[in-house]
């Protein structure tokens, strides 16, 4: 296994001293305000009027940008995806797939670090509301297909669906450690991710065998329900996938 370099503590970018920060577009103001509110209250308790007031926009502007609260989460996730995809490390190209994926997911966690409180809030809401958890899972799978691609791991076809769903569940388990990891270097989170990827290799191999010999059944099983191995993984790593 290649030696992993020490990772710098994640930080929000700061404007130059003495210079006013650039004005955010209305859409970005709303996303930022929504995640600030999530740090204070549950997803289901946030009202449109409170959100518009926190963002400093009118209700008409809020409605123009977003039709409901879930698309705000989706927009945030897309922004995180883009940040991770833009930060690729060419030096990782020759590393094994597991190491490349570890690097990609750690970059994702570093990008998420300023919003730990909001993510913790969303995780709690997903546990209380199965329909919300299901919606989050759809976002998570889409996002993790991009993360697999960033790690140069095939994410196309039925096998890609399997990999993305498995990775979404694995990452949800890691997030449970991440939201309570107070170390700036995310040492506990790195260890949790390392263990999760090790455990996930067995599960991934079992389902990839299914895809190899019966690709139609592979895709349909993801729609109809989980196999016993998937339920075991859920029990070990978390009840739901969170789209981060």
PLM regions and their residue ranges:
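Short, hydrophobic secondary-structure boundary micro-motifs
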Residues: 47, 120-122, 135, 156
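Short, basic, alpha-helical segments at the C-terminal edge of helix-turn-helix-like DNA-binding modules
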Residues: 77-84
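Amphipathic alpha-helical interaction segments
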Residues: 29, 50, 103, 121, ...
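Amphipathic alpha-helical packing segments from all-alpha helical-bundle domains
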Residues: 130-153, 161-175, 191, 199
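Hydrophobic alpha-helical connector segments
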Residues: 75, 89-124, 128, 138
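Short, Lys/Arg-enriched anionic-surface-contact patches
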Residues: 17-30
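Helix-turn-helix
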Residues: 2, 29, 37-75
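C-terminal peripheral helix-coil segments that are non-catalytic and often amphipathic
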Residues: 2-13, 180-244
């Amino acid at each position: 296994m290649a030696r992993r370099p020490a990772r710098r503590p994640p930080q929000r970018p700061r404007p130059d001293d003495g210079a006013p920060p650039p004005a955010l577009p209305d859409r970005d103001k709303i996303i930022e305000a929504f995640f600030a509110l999530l740090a204070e209250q549950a997803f289901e308790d946030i009202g449109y009027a409170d959100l518009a007031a926190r963002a400093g926009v009118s209700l008409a502007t809020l409605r123009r940008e977003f039709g409901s609260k879930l698309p705000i989460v989706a927009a945030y996730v897309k922004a995180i995806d883009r940040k991770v995809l833009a930060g690729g490390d060419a030096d990782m190209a020759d590393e094994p797939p597991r190491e490349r994926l570890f690097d990609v997911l750690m970059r994702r966690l570093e990008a998420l670090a300023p919003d730990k409180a909001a993510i913790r809030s969303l995780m709690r809401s997903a546990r209380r509301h199965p329909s919300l958890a299901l919606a989050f899972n759809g976002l998570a799978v889409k996002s993790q297909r991009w993360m697999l691609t960033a790690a140069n791991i095939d994410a196309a076809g039925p096998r890609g669906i399997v990999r993305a769903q498995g990775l979404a569940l694995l990452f949800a388990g890691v997030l449970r450690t991440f939201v309570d990891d107070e170390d700036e270097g995310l040492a506990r989170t790195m260890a949790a991710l390392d263990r999760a990827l090790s455990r996930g290799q067995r599960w991934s191999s079992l389902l990839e065998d299914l895809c190899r010999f019966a690709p139609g059944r592979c895709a349909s099983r993801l729609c109809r329900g989980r196999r016993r191995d998937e339920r075991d993984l859920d029990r070990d790593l978390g009840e739901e996938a969170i789209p981060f």
